[in-house]
């Protein structure tokens, strides 16, 4: 064991832009980076309860050996692929959120990620993302290049539902190259058509703002996630400002052959985060950035017969940044007492993490955005 202390939509190439006119809002001088671990990362092998005999009984083949765990406490440690994060843990810039979930969880990929993106209740259906509502409550400055940038996916996720200036792109260079050749997606509504010229100008302006071309000393990992992190840092390097960036690391739906797949993905994640920190330190932005992971759900504690795990509930997530108060938050799932479908009870409502960002990072009233009071998780320094 290793121990360590209603929008107008335009698309071109692989990019999509949604713009809506709105008044200038409050200044968002702190950035949120969301990292989606798409498919449902297995939290139990991410933060390993290496002293719990139930863990090894439920996972005779998949359990991480005690000697391989990167120890964080006398009970829990990280998957060995996450060893690059040990320095962040020692620096108290890594918060580990345990048992994250919500009441009456849904185990469908599509429905559960919708719940996370909209911050809705399990039986509530909304079209507007939680960030869409946040920026409606307190708009970002019009001088910003955009409210948010989605990298590596055409799905706007928490920025969906209209009313945001959101840019979704797969490749910055392609986005810039094709910006002036944009063609409108057919939409209905005279009000939208009346803004065509304004939107076209906004597209070109946004492309120009994203053309940071900052020459980083940081070396970024190869692969799609490393490229996405590099693109995110280029977006943040532009002086015009952006409130949120989301990047996606996909492949976590590990019903079969989980061990190798998750090890590779967690290594990609850890290496990407280390590069992200290095680049943001170069930009003098690390102390003004918080990184938050999320996924549609976790995995069941009991391994299946295919060398994998099935859809589960309570999960582990990370918050990282220069102003993060590092440590363990929440409580580890009680895997000795599982529900009838083989899942543990959650400890932290995921909307508490959102409330932390809204109330304590941006100064936006979380009750208005989330439709109720959710206790913030104190992973940010005062």
Predicted features by range, described:
Residues 307-308, 348:
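Short Gly/Pro-enriched turn/cap motifs at secondary-structure boundaries
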Residues 311-313:
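Phosphate-handling catalytic cores of nucleic-acid transaction enzymes
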């Amino acid at each position: 064991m290793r121990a360590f202390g209603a929008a107008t939509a335009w698309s071109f190439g692989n990019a999509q832009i949604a713009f809506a006119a709105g008044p200038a809002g409050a200044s968002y001088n702190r950035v949120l980076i969301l990292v989606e671990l798409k498919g449902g990362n297995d939290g139990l092998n991410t933060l390993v309860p290496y002293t719990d005999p139930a863990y090894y009984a439920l996972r005779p083949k998949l359990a991480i050996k005690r000697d391989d765990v990167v120890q964080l406490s006398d009970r829990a440690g990280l998957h060995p692929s996450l060893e690059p994060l040990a320095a962040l843990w020692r620096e108290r810039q890594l918060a580990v959120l345990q048992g994250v979930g919500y009441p009456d969880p849904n185990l469908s990929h599509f429905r559960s990620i919708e719940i996370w993106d909209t911050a809705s209740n399990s039986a509530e259906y909304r079209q507007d993302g939680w960030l869409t509502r946040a920026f409606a409550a307190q708009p970002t400055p019009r001088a910003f290049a955009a409210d948010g940038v989605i990298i590596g996916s055409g799905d706007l996720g928490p920025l969906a539902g209209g009313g945001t200036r959101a840019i979704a792109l797969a490749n910055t260079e392609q986005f810039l190259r094709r910006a002036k050749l944009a063609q409108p997606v057919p939409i209905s509504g005279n009000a939208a058509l009346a803004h065509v010229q304004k939107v076209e100008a906004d597209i070109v302006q946004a492309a120009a703002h994203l053309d940071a071309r900052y020459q980083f000393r940081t070396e970024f990992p190869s692969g799609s996630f490393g490229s996405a992190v590099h693109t995110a840092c280029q977006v943040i390097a532009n002086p015009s400002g952006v409130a949120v960036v989301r990047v996606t690391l996909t492949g976590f739906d590990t019903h079969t052959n989980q061990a190798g797949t998750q090890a590779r993905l967690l290594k990609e994640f850890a290496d990407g985060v280390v590069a992200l920190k290095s680049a943001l330190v170069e930009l003098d932005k690390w102390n003004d950035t918080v990184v938050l992971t999320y996924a549609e759900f976790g995995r069941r504690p009991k391994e299946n017969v295919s060398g994998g795990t099935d859809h589960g509930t309570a999960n582990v997530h990370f918050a990282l940044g220069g102003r993060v108060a590092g440590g363990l938050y929440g409580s580890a799932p009680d895997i000795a007492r599982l529900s009838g479908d083989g899942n543990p009870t959650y400890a932290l409502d995921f909307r508490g993490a959102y409330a932390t960002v809204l109330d304590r990072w941006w100064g936006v009233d979380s009750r208005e955005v989330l439709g109720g009071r959710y206790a913030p998780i104190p992973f940010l320094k005062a």
